[in-house]
C-alpha cells in the first residue's frame, strides 16, 4: 500500500484501538488526529483499507479494528522504535546489575520483562552449543565429599557434590583432587563443551594408578555437568498478565497457556525466531504468523542477547494479544536485551 494518507489512517486506527480497546470510527479519527481531510475522505480510506484486508468490522459495530495484516504493516512501517525514558533505563540497569550469576540474570530478566510490558515473558538460557569451558574447580568439602564446579565462558555455572567412595581418607582425596584439577583444566579449558566431554576418557586413562579410581568418579560427574550444560532451557513469567487480558486473545486463553507449558514448543518457537532474525535483532511475529497450535492468536516480540554484537547466545521476549502496544513493547525488549548483553560481556 503506497498511499501515505491511508497508512496514516491505519496507524491512527491501530493506536486508538490499542489504547481504547474499542472499534474506531471515522469521526473519532478526525477528532483525535490531525489528518487534514474530511470525515468522508477518512471513510473512503477506511473502506479501501477494509477491502485490502488491513482492518475489519467486528460484529455490528460501526467502528473498525486492525487485522493481523494491518498490525504487520503498522510494525513494518514504524519509523523508529519508541525510546525508553532515562528513568526507565536506569531502573532496568539497576535491577539487572544486582544479579549474581547466569541463573539470577535469567530470573531477574524474565520477571522484569513481564512487569514492564504486562505480557507473558520468555527468556531462553544462553545456548551452550558454542560455549567453551572457562574453568573447572575441584574442592574437598569434608570427609570423602568434594565439590565440582564447571564454569563456561558465557557465565553458566554447573556444580555437583560428589561422595568419592574410592578415596582412602580425606587427606589422600585432597591431594588427588589438587592433581586432577590441574590436569582437567589443562585438558578442557577453552574447548567446546561437547569436545571437552569427549576428552574425559583419555584424561582418566592418563591418570596415575593411585588416583585412577578418584579420577573415574570425577570424570563421570564432570561428564554430567557438561551434558547438562548442553541442554536448551527456557523460563517463563507473567502468565497472569495473559489471564487479565484474556478477552483480547482471538484464540482461547486455555490454548495459549497450554502451549506455554510445553517448553518444547517454546524452544522450537525461539529457534524459528532466531533463524528469522538478523544477528539477534528485534523480531515480531503477529497472529497467524505463529504456526504453533494455540499461539496463532498472539503476537511475539523477541530480541537476541549475548556477549557481543556477533555473539548471540539466546533470545528473550514477550508474548501477548495481537492488540499490543508494539512500539513500547519493542523498545522494552530491545532495552532489556542490550543491558543483559552488557552484563554478560563483563
Curated annotation (Swiss-Prot):
Function: Negative regulator of class I heat shock genes (grpE-dnaK-dnaJ and groELS operons). Prevents heat-shock induction of these operons.
Cited NCBIfam families: hrcA
Protein name, entry field: Heat-inducible transcription repressor HrcA
Keywords for this protein: Repressor, Stress response, Transcription, Transcription regulation
The family this protein is said to belong to: Belongs to the HrcA family.
A GO MF term: DNA binding
GO biological process: negative regulation of DNA-templated transcription
Family matches, as HAMAP family: HrcA
Chloroplast as UniProt keyword: no
SUPFAM superfamilies (UniProt xref): GAF domain-like (SSF55781), Winged helix' DNA-binding domain (SSF46785)
Amino acid at each position: 500500500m503506497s498511499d501515505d494518507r491511508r497508512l496514516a489512517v491505519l496507524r491512527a486506527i491501530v493506536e486508538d484501538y490499542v489504547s481504547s480497546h474499542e472499534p474506531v470510527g471515522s469521526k473519532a479519527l478526525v477528532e483525535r488526529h490531525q489528518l487534514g481531510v474530511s470525515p468522508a475522505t477518512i471513510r473512503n480510506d477506511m473502506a479501501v483499507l477494509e477491502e485490502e484486508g488491513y482492518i475489519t468490522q467486528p460484529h455490528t459495530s460501526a467502528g473498525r479494528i486492525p487485522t493481523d495484516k494491518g498490525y504487520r504493516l503498522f510494525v513494518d512501517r514504524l519509523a523508529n522504535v519508541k525510546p525508553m525514558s532515562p528513568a526507565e533505563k536506569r531502573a532496568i540497569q539497576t535491577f539487572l546489575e544486582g544479579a549474581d550469576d547466569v541463573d539470577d540474570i535469567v530470573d531477574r530478566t524474565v520477571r522484569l520483562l513481564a512487569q514492564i510490558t504486562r505480557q507473558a515473558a520468555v527468556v531462553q538460557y544462553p545456548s551452550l552449543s558454542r560455549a567453551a569451558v572457562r574453568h573447572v574447580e575441584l574442592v574437598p568439602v569434608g570427609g570423602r565429599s568434594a565439590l565440582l564446579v564447571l564454569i563456561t565462558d558465557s557465565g553458566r555455572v554447573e556444580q555437583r557434590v560428589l561422595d568419592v567412595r574410592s578415596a582412602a581418607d580425606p587427606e589422600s582425596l585432597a591431594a588427588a583432587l589438587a592433581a586432577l584439577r590441574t590436569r582437567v583444566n589443562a585438558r578442557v579449558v577453552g574447548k567446546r563443551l561437547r569436545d571437552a566431554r569427549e576428552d574425559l576418557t583419555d584424561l582418566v586413562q592418563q591418570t596415575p594408578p593411585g588416583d585412577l579410581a578418584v579420577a573415574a568418579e570425577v570424570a563421570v560427574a564432570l561428564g554430567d555437568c557438561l551434558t547438562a550444560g548442553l541442554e536448551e532451557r527456557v523460563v517463563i513469567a507473567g502468565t497472569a498478565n495473559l489471564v487479565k487480558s484474556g478477552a483480547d486473545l482471538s484464540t482461547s486463553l486455555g490454548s495459549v497457556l497450554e502451549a506455554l507449558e510445553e517448553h518444547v514448543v517454546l524452544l522450537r518457537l525461539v529457534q524459528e525466531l532466531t533463524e528469522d532474525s538478523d544477528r539477534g535483532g528485534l523480531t515480531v511475529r503477529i497472529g497467524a504468523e505463529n504456526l504453533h497450535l494455540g499461539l496463532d492468536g498472539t503476537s511475539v516480540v523477541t530480541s537476541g542477547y549475548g556477549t557481543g554484537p556477533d555473539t548471540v547466545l539466546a533470545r528473550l521476549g514477550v508474548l501477548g494479544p495481537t492488540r499490543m502496544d508494539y512500539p513500547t513493547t519493542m523498545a522494552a525488549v530491545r532495552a532489556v536485551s542490550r543491558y543483559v548483553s552488557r552484563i554478560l560481556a563483563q
